[in-house]
UniProtKB/Swiss-Prot annotation:
Summary of subunit composition and partner proteins: Component of the F-actin capping complex, composed of a heterodimer of an alpha and a beta subunit. Component of the WASH complex, composed of F-actin-capping protein subunit alpha (CAPZA1, CAPZA2 or CAPZA3), F-actin-capping protein subunit beta (CAPZB), WASHC1, WASHC2, WASHC3, WASHC4 and WASHC5. Interacts with RCSD1/CAPZIP. Directly interacts with CRACD; this interaction decreases binding to actin.
GO molecular function: actin filament binding
Family: Belongs to the F-actin-capping protein alpha subunit family.
Protein name as it appears in the record: F-actin-capping protein subunit alpha-2
Modified residues (N-acetylalanine): A2
Entries under Pfam families matching the protein: F-actin_cap_A
GO CC terms: cortical cytoskeleton; F-actin capping protein complex
Keywords of the record: Acetylation, Actin capping, Actin-binding, Phosphoprotein
Superkingdom of this protein's organism: Eukaryota
Function: F-actin-capping proteins bind in a Ca(2+)-independent manner to the fast growing ends of actin filaments (barbed end) thereby blocking the exchange of subunits at these ends. Unlike other capping proteins (such as gelsolin and severin), these proteins do not sever actin filaments.
Phosphoserine modified-residue sites: S9
InterPro entries recorded: CapZ_alpha (IPR002189), CapZ_alpha/beta (IPR037282), CapZ_alpha/beta_2 (IPR042276), CapZ_alpha_1 (IPR042489), F-actin_cap_asu_CS (IPR017865)
BP term (GO), one: actin cytoskeleton organization
Length: 286
């Protein structure tokens, strides 16, 4: 191990550490960070060299954050990244600084975003918040209105998680939906992601995603929002149902095939008669 450490440059050590951090399971960032910190044994090198990994993890995971003085949480995503460690809260029309390591929001200030699309953004957000409240008990959503390549674009992000460290599992749901405001009809593009880590009697991760495309009729803001939510609800329900059915199938077939039904002797041990077996006598005499 000592020879290996001597062969690795600081740059290589940081690259490896950053990869561990970026791939940390949901809810386990601190545990992975602390382990990497012990392995690297150089706090300054870790903080400076792997800072991009801290940021990338939060952006990829749609990390929710509470801003002091405001009721609703906001998601940390690439769509709200204003640069220099600042992020947008479109609902409250503020920007704030975000510490990617501590996961804390500070210094909220007024911020004016795209006013031309604000009425559309607000309508979509109102409908999406109602949907998230109904379907995701711990869900958070953030809706952005941006001009991309000259087109007014809505981007809706949803995050919901369950962290059950005491029960040895953690999981997170993420979905992202995007469409442009155009006459008559437009195309909705979505991506749904599930990541679950179970580690009580083993180390198993589920990492799954699905891409969605559908057409959306564009009329007024309120009606368009209703039609958009119908698409979101149908796609997310179908995906979650498919995941559940696949797991049931694997439980009934694949997982059972991994475990031998009988010992190599092809006979089961009668635990009530264990003392009459030679091994039982040996255990008694031990």
């Amino acid at each position: 191990m000592a020879d290996l450490e001597e062969q690795l440059s600081d740059e290589e050590k940081v690259r490896i550490a950053a990869k561990f951090i970026i791939h940390a399971p949901p809810g386990e960032f601190n545990e992975v960070f602390n382990d990497v910190r012990l392995l690297l044994n150089n706090d300054n090198l870790l903080r400076e060299g792997a800072a991009h990994a801290f940021a990338q993890y939060n952006l990829d995971q749609f990390t929710p954050v509470k801003i002091e003085g405001y009721e609703d949480q906001v998601l940390i995503t690439e769509h709200g990244d204003l640069g220099n460690g600042k992020f947008l809260d479109p609902k409250n029309r503020i920007c704030f600084k975000f510490d990617h390591l501590r996961k804390e929001a500070t210094d909220p200030r007024p911020y004016e975003a795209e006013n031309a699309i604000e009425s559309w953004r607000t309508s979509i957000e109102t409908a999406l918040r109602a949907y998230v409240k109904e379907h995701y008990p711990n869900g958070v959503c953030t809706v952005y209105g941006k001009k991309i390549d000259g087109q007014q674009t809505i981007i809706a992000c949803i995050e919901s998680h369950q962290f059950q460290a005491k029960n040895f599992w953690n999981g997170r749901w993420r979905s992202e939906w995007k469409f442009t405001i155009s006459p008559s009809a437009t195309q909705v593009v979505g991506i749904l992601k599930i990541q679950v880590h179970y580690y009580e009697d083993g180390n198993v991760q589920l990492v799954s995603h699905k891409d969605i495309q559908d057409s959306l009729t564009v009329s007024n803001e309120v009606q368009t929002a209703k039609e958009f939510i119908k698409i979101v609800e149908a796609a997310e329900n179908e995906y979650q149902t498919a995941i559940s059915e696949n797991y049931q199938t694997m439980s009934d077939t694949t997982f059972k095939a991994l475990r031998r039904q009988l010992p190599v002797t092809r006979t089961k041990i009668d635990w009530n008669k264990i003392l009459s077996y030679k091994i039982g006598k040996e255990m008694q005499n031990a």
